[in-house]
Every structure is written in C-alpha cells, then in structure tokens.
Amino acid sequence: PKDRRVLLDLGHVLQPNWGHKLVGNEYLFVNDSTVEGTIRTQGWAHFHAVSYRITFSEPIETLYQYIDGNLRKDSLFLRLNTPGDLKFHYKFAENNKPLYVKVAISPVDTDGAERNMLAELPGWDFDATRVESAHIWNKALNDIQIESSDPKVMVNFYTALYHTMIAPYAYQDVDGRYLGMDKKVHRAEPG
C-alpha cells in the first residue's frame, strides 16, 4: 500500500456528554518504533489514569502531531505534556508487508505497561497470538454449556457469559502493582 498510516487519538473520551473529560496527556517518543504515555481523565471516576506502551513492527517514517486540531510545526519532539486533544498520524514506509502494532496498558505507569507487554506479548507472531487467544476464550466459554435449538438463545447466552468474564476485572500489572482507591500504588499478593 502506498499510504500506510496509523492514527493515535489520545483526545477521545467515552461519554463526554456525562461530564467525562480529558485532563492530562503525557506522551513520549521512546524510539523510532515505540511510544508511551499516560492519559488522565475525570468524570465517571474522579481521577482515572491509563498508561500505555505502543510498539510498531517497523520504524515510523513521518510523524504528524495535532493539538486541539492544529498541526504542530515543531513535530520533532521527544516528550509532550498537555491537557489538549492530542492526535498523532504515524506514516510508515511504502511496502506490501503487514504492519503490526502491539499495545499494552497499565493502571500504574509506563514502566508497568512495558513489563506487561514483555510478559504477555513478547513476540511478533500475529497468527500464533490469534490462535492462543481463541484457545483461551474457547476454554473459558466452554466451562458452561447449554443446549438450545434457537441460535439466538445460544448467541445471547454466550455473549452474556463473555461479558461476565470482562467485567468486573482485576486491573493490575504482571508484577501485582495497582493503583488503589487512595490513589497510591499497592501490590497484590500472588494467587
């Protein structure tokens, strides 16, 4: 493909009409294929932060950054901290290879996101990751089985079962660190 781009929208928030808003955006260009940062919001939760690390399978060729819809002319930066609506367009070299993107998050910090990525997705084998993910979900969804001749009943049941497995959730790093209700970092005991 001639125009290989990825848009990273760090200004989007869910339910802005309910008062959920962006209050901080930290961004770091780690190297030519890795970025990381922390997004801070307020609204449904008084204070909510998500740290992330994003690694591309190829170097970023060109970077365009926008704050509040305006293209910044000084796009050659390493670190940025703004409460503004922050978006990036990453342009990659023209070729026919697939572009892979790995994303990890942390409730604590970018170091946690990096450790989570290394522990949970160390390689670049997309097909193996897809197969492993399908196996994990199939095992979980097959723990309870129902019978019905109505496909709608089956879809409804297994969709509801899937939903029970994604929320509520334990949100912590692979090393057990998490951000408590007191906004301090704690460590969960293994097990």
Where are these regions (language model features)?
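Beta-sandwich/jelly-roll carbohydrate-recognition scaffolds of carbohydrate-active enzymes
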Residues: 1-191
